[in-house]
Amino acid sequence: MWKLVVLFWLLCLLIIFGIVGLALAAEFTFTYVPFEDEQITSVSLRGSFNSWGEWPMEKQPDGTWSITVDLEPGEYQYKFFINGKWPQDMSTARAGGPIDPNAIGYINDGFGGQNAICRIKEEVTEGVVLVHNPDAPAYLCIADERLVLRLKTSPHKVAKVFLVTDEGRWSMERQLQWEYGEVFRLSLKFPDSLKYRFVGYTIEGTEFSLPEDPSQSFFFDGIDHFPQLKWVSKGTIYQIFPERFYNGNPKNDILAIGSDEFHYNEQWAQNKLWAEEGPSLANWNAPVSSQHCCHQYFGGDLAGIIEKLDYLKGLGVTALYLNPIFDSGSAHGYDTHDYMKVSSKFGTEEDLQELLNEAHKRGMRVILDFVPNHTGLGFWAFQDVVKNGEDSPYWDWYFIHKWPFSPGDPSAYEAWWGVGSLPKLNTGNLEVREYLFKVVRYWLNFGADGWRVDVPNELVEAQTFFREMRQITKMEKPDAYLIAEIWQLDPSWVQGDQFDSLMNYALGRDILFNFAKGSIDGEGTLDNLCRYFAAYGENVTAMGFNLVSSHDTGRILTDLGGGNFGDLPNPEAVEKLKLLSTLLYTLPGAPVIFQGDERGILGEKEFYDAHRYPIQWDTADESLIAHYKKLAQLRSEIPALTSSVIRVYYGTDNLLSFFKGEQGNGEVLVVANNGSETVKFELPFGNWRSVTEGEVLQGTIYIPSLQVRIFERL
């Protein structure tokens, strides 16, 4: 007997706890086994399943530490947080083996270390699971000015689904299909309001409905509660690390030394950590020093960005994302000294205003970096605490453990990842929130077009903070773009109440990169793409901040096997980068270029910080630059390439293919081959035009090695 499992009334509980899935969660136990002589006071579990938050583990009678949690099917990354510290590499413990022998593998954590990987298998259940939550964008949203409705079902059990309204019924298309589920989709002209329900048939022919009671319906109120930003959907974003981009005004270079953290960090001075090499100015092509990450200054500035705007315009760039430009004590700028002041090493407020004006003239938006979780040692409130202790009005702005203390000593106060130069702010304090929101308002009114937010998952009372920040931001500038630095797949941040997008490493780095590198085949990649696009609303993926590299990863060309800093790029790796970037430009959302990737810049496998080396403007791989220009041109000319709609088609061995755009004339088919040999591919029925060659094709075609072909349906 076929048994129907309908998750309708249970959705209330699912919504409350943020659990929206197709398969029942399974119990999984994580265990840490210390060495016999190891003194362990605390162990916690952090991973992609909890936004890298902290789940304390319990000490067991046998001396091990463990925790049992419920996780939905899929693969997850994680680390054990031992005695309040991150292990850099989960694959290597003191004796040479892994920290967690139960891990099924390891993956680059983006910071030069390795995360462990676990896999949760699907619990086999009888019947069909149906899920539709009208309050979640993954099931109902407005995308490309159409109402999108989706139903998630068990895999390989449903033959047909219809959407039923008072006006009639419409057949829904099977949009996504992966190991743990399927998604049926329908888009309609944006209605004033809509009562609707789902009716369908299993592969055995049994009818089902959702809601199960025919007298009940779901309801859409006709209001777009989470507007899509079209300028993002149709755009191309370029990330700039200002200190290493271009030196447009050498006169301000020396100012970097005067504001450096060196002047505030007593702990470093006491331990003589600056004895051999302190903060320094370097020529634009000087060798990388041991202080390259943070205190080797090359002179990049706002004037340099202004000077290169026409170059960026020529690449098809429509928005800039700038790493922190406010007063700070480092080259990277994530140790803010004054949120209301442009760093003197980059220029003045007048320089920033000129940059905004010149960018806007060219049709470019400018997104700034915001760091509300922690400050630098030179931040005025922290300096007041250093001097006055509990008598300081800013004592409760931080989490101070003892006083007096030496600035830079992480045992004296809470700091980001235990880094003493980054004391953690108490964003649960109303005064702190009011100050930070004042910063948000000021720079939006100054002309900024959005915020990328650093480590949002680490803030105290994060959800409260970002819900309020969103309200303030959208009130000041409704089309401002809000991006969260979340590395994993996590829809909870993009439900319309906090952010517009995550930094989508989960798409570009975890899925596309591994296909381009050849680490996963087309079938596995298609499965991962389905899981990704099923998790998010189409309005969200249309606003995706889609990147494959950044200031926090290795250089993408090096990671693809292109060689190390100073080498000539390996030609095969260049072709892999072209394949990877083409996929990035054809999927929903805005492709993001990290400065210099379009020029073929290499980094170092062994020295992580070299990926931030200054762009050498006299050298470039011209074929890559031409490639990126062509991709931007295609996105501007072919509407389907910037559509929010994706449908999977075929994936196996070295082949990956998917559709973009609504079904019918004008939709495009993207076909990629990550292998070393030419492969045969059967086009779907009809006439297809190659968007690069112009020829009209039918039937069997051949896709060369490491190539992507794009076809438009006629």
Please report, for each region that a protein language model flagged, where it lies by residue.
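C-terminal beta-strand-rich structural cap/linker in extracellular carbohydrate-active enzymes
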Residues: 698-714
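Conserved, mostly hydrophobic/aromatic
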Residues: 151, 240, 312, 322, ...
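Non-catalytic, glycine-rich low-complexity segments
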Residues: 107-156, 227-230
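Active-site-proximal helices and loops of the catalytic beta/alpha 8
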Residues: 353-368, 373-390, 438-441, 449-544, ...
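Aromatic/acidic polysaccharide-binding cleft in carbohydrate-active enzymes
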Residues: 243, 496, 545-566, 581-621
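Substrate-binding/active-site clefts of carbohydrate-active enzymes
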Residues: 242-319, 325-446, 468-475, 492
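Aromatic-rich carbohydrate-binding modules that target alpha-glucans
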Residues: 26-75, 83-118, 155-191, 201-214
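Carbohydrate-binding surface patches
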Residues: 648-684
